């Protein structure tokens, strides 16, 4: 696969993978979608249980987990992709993982994020700032940011707060681009429904 063509990536908040039937359904879904890379958030797998996640045709599986059944992120790389791993950085509480490698001798960095429910904009901003030396034109950042970037991605049209605006400024300073919003600037699609507030929002992104 040449980087000059395309790289298909899917991302999904799985909300726990401790049930065997759920892991099986996920494996079937990944095989049906057939991407090159799959990023998962909220796996809720403890460090000693990560071996339970298996997908045929996907031997390269990278996890970041906590010692409790909380958070947890995973990056799976398809066997059909000639990916050579160079470095892996894991958050000890399972909120992000970064893998650095190459595809046909072209460097690539993939960061998968699951931001905490409380203080998500500040968390993501601080994480991106701490990693700015690792971020370049071949960096892809994927995940559940737990915060809408703009009022366009809220069903209530609630005004963007100061913390989120500061995060947006950091994203701009790092020359990161919201891929979906770039191609669909006026589309109102949502990835999350809050039953408590009866609102829809888009909190899952690829930069």
Language-model segments: which ranges?
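A shared catalytic/ligand-binding motif for oxyanion handling
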Residues: 1-207
């Amino acid at each position: 696969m040449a980087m000059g063509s395309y790289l298909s990536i899917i991302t999904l908040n799985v909300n726990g993978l401790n049930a065997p039937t759920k892991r099986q359904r996920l494996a079937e879904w990944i095989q049906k979608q057939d991407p090159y890379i799959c990023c998962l958030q909220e796996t809720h797998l403890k460090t000693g249980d990560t071996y339970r996640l298996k997908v045929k045709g996907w031997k390269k599986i990278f996890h970041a987990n906590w010692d409790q059944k909380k958070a947890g992120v995973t990056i799976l790389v398809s066997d059909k992709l000639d990916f050579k791993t160079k470095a892996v950085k894991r958050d000890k509480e399972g909120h992000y993982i970064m893998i650095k490698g190459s595809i046909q001798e072209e460097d690539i960095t993939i960061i998968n994020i699951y931001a905490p429910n409380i203080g998500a904009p500040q968390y993501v901003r601080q994480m991106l700032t701490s990693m700015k030396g690792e971020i370049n034109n071949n960096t892809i950042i994927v995940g559940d940011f737990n915060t809408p970037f703009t009022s366009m991605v809220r069903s209530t049209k609630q005004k963007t707060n100061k913390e989120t605006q500061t995060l947006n400024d950091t994203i701009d300073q790092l020359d990161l681009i919201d891929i979906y919003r770039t191609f669909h600037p006026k589309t109102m699609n949502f990835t999350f429904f809050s039953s408590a507030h009866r609102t829809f929002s888009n909190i899952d992104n690829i930069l």
